[in-house]
Amino acid sequence: MTDQVLAEQRIGQNTEVTLHFALRLENGDTVDSTFDKAPATFKVGDGNLLPGFEAALFGFKAGDKRTLQILPENAFGQPNPQNVQIIPRSQFQNMDLSEGLLVIFNDAANTELPGVVKAFDDAQVTIDFNHPLAGKTLTFDVEIIDVKAL
């Protein structure tokens, strides 16, 4: 009888990963976390994770705990000035506006487009359609629970 040592499955293509994560901003604010609830499970390459975050996980195995920094270019990108629009105030009748208010618009294909009110006056409203985390360096604390080959 021979002893076989099975290599621990590492994160890579054709794997399913279960992990806990906490997403923090540079100022330390936690944006999202699974540590106080059920862990997240995903298949590598399924598009559910930021590509930069997913790539940073490659090579990790169950039991690994790491802190990863993801630069804006590998996360939500830099803010695009063309995603800031000025809209006539008349399109917001009967709406109580405030800076920071999230407003949902529908495009021609009826897809929801969230935007944040950046400024407003009696004539116009400035809406920022950039992702709220655009331009931010993200920190992920991760604990790998399980890695399975698919």
Swiss-Prot record:
| Gene designation | yaaD
* SUPFAM superfamilies xref list: FKBP-like
Q: State the family named in the UniProt similarity comment for this chain.
A: Belongs to the FKBP-type PPIase family.
Q: What Pfam family is a match, any one?
A: FKBP_C
Q: For this chain's UniProt record, which GO biological process terms are given?
A: protein folding
Q: Which GO terms describe its molecular function?
A: peptidyl-prolyl cis-trans isomerase activity
**Recorded catalytic activity of this chain's protein:** [protein]-peptidylproline (omega=180) = [protein]-peptidylproline (omega=0)
The record's EC number reads 5.2.1.8
UniProt name for this protein? Probable FKBP-type 16 kDa peptidyl-prolyl cis-trans isomerase
Q: Which InterPro entries match?
A: PPIase_dom_sf, PPIase_FKBP_dom, SlpA/SlyD-like_ins_sf
Its biological purpose is as follows: PPIases accelerate the folding of proteins.
Q: Which Gene3D superfamilies match?
A: 2.40.10.330, 3.10.50.40
Sorted keywords for this record are:
Isomerase, Rotamase
| Cysteines engaged in disulfide bonds, as pairs | none
* PPIase FKBP-type domain boundaries: 14-88
